[in-house]
């Protein structure tokens, strides 16, 4: 009897092997009841409300509300159990129907390093076609805050090597950053607005050079209510429909920009750690403060300008200086 020819698996779309979502308390309880009824084995995970292991599948629901489903059976479980029986929403595999704008040719902009004591602020602009966005979603490209540094580096290489993509970043070494921060009136948002406009302008030029056209619009992960980037683009003579909204990283092209920005930031942190002989942590909490004290102790307070954002309160503290008094917050009126 002739053996059935094996179907070429390369022709089949790759199934999703990981899915992350937020569940409210009622949904989390419903999911737990389903897993218990299925006889799945529970196991311990740090910071998890519960975790269960099934055939080819692990499900971990964290106390924060985040639920992570991983393993070969992820896609089938999400489509045939989680969505119909727990969330009541069909999302997986319906990205294009639910968010058609994701698959239009457009630019995405995001930044990294804004809240970190050490290392630069990095602006990134990525311009992609709908086909690129589809491919990136399948590869797991999402907001960089949900990814490890190792995964970010891997996805950064994939994004940059995608044929036809335009990728531009803007950042400067720390001494120059501190100089520009002062020049922009010690207003980080104004400086970031200029950086994003620069990245966007350069990416538009690159994309046009490759494709003889420009995308019709772009999306910025909103960092201020003021249209600072749009104003900078206008000042540069660049006409472009740049939209902005919070949590824009759900858009795959903005997510790609967030990954590119984070990868560049991590590379710079690693370089600075090597230069200073001190492992410089991310963030601006106690670990960063201790690293700053060690750095200043070894190389002197004047060296901090080459490693840290001097306007951070922690940067004053590690040099034994009194931080300047905070200015009272005044909300500006929106333009009519």
Regions found by a protein language model. Name each.
Residues 2-336:
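RNase H-like, Mg2+-dependent phosphodiesterase core
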């Amino acid at each position: 009897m002739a053996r059935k020819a094996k179907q070429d698996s390369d022709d089949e779309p790759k199934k999703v092997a990981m899915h992350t979502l937020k569940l409210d308390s009622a949904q989390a309880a419903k999911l737990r009841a389903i897993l218990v009824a299925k006889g799945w084995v529970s196991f311990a995970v740090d910071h998890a409300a519960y975790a269960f292991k099934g055939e080819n599948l692990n499900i971990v629901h964290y106390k924060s509300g985040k639920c992570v489903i991983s393993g070969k059976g992820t896609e089938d479980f999400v489509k045939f159990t989680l969505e119909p029986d727990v969330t009541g929403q069909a999302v997986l595999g319906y990205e294009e129907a639910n968010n058609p704008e994701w698959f239009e040719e457009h630019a995405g902009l995001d930044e990294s390093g804004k809240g970190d004591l050490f290392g630069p602020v990095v602006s990134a602009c990525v311009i992609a076609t709908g086909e690129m966005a589809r491919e990136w979603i399948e590869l797991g490209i999402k907001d960089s805050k949900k990814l490890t540094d190792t995964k970010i580096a891997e996805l950064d290489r994939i994004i940059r090597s995608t044929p036809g993509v335009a990728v531009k970043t803007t950042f400067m070494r720390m001494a120059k950053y501190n100089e520009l921060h002062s020049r922009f009136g010690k207003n980080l948002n104004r400086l970031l607005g200029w950086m994003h406009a620069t990245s966007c302008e350069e990416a538009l030029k690159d994309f046009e050079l490759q494709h003889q056209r420009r995308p019709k619009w772009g999306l910025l992960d909103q960092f201020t209510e003021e249209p600072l980037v749009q104003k900078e683009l206008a000042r540069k003579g660049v006409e472009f429909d740049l939209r902005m909204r919070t949590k824009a990283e759900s858009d795959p092209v903005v997510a790609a920009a967030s990954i590119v920005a984070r990868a560049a930031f991590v590379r710079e942190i690693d370089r600075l750690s090597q230069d200073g002989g001190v492992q410089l942590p991310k963030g601006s909490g106690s670990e960063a403060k201790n690293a700053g004290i060690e750095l200043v102790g070894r190389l002197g307070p004047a060296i901090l300008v080459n490693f840290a954002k001097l306007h951070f309160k922690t940067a004053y503290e590690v040099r034994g200086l009194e931080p300047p008094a905070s200015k009272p917050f005044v909300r500006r009126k929106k333009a009519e």
